[in-house]
């Protein structure tokens, strides 16, 4: 509502070259009708691409881009997800978690985490892990995301060192 509604957000993100996603409704709409949650979606790859654009293009004033990066680095939620395997490393992670309500089948509609990792060697990667319609517990979903994060971290640290 602050930028003109879902259609304005959708159009702007498409103007950046991101295509495999949809923003049709607001967060409030989704909380009022859980089945509507499926109207807003993105592939993990497109979400990671959008984050990469945010990190590398001048979309806003520098101070606002730095603010967004720092807010992600300071994120306190979901430390058992993407950040978990990085906690005892020198890597810096910025991330944003997402969690949904349960659907009519009692499944978590979505458990997500998207972020960027700054490695000690100066390289960076972006990552997005989305779990949809999960019958697993929140703890198990977090472990799944953490294990994927660990595989990616090992790939980058072992491939580039």
Q: Where are these predicted regions, by residue range?
A:
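Structured C-terminal helix/loop/strand segments within mature extracytoplasmic catalytic/sensor domains
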Residues: 2-3, 49-81, 85-91, 100-161
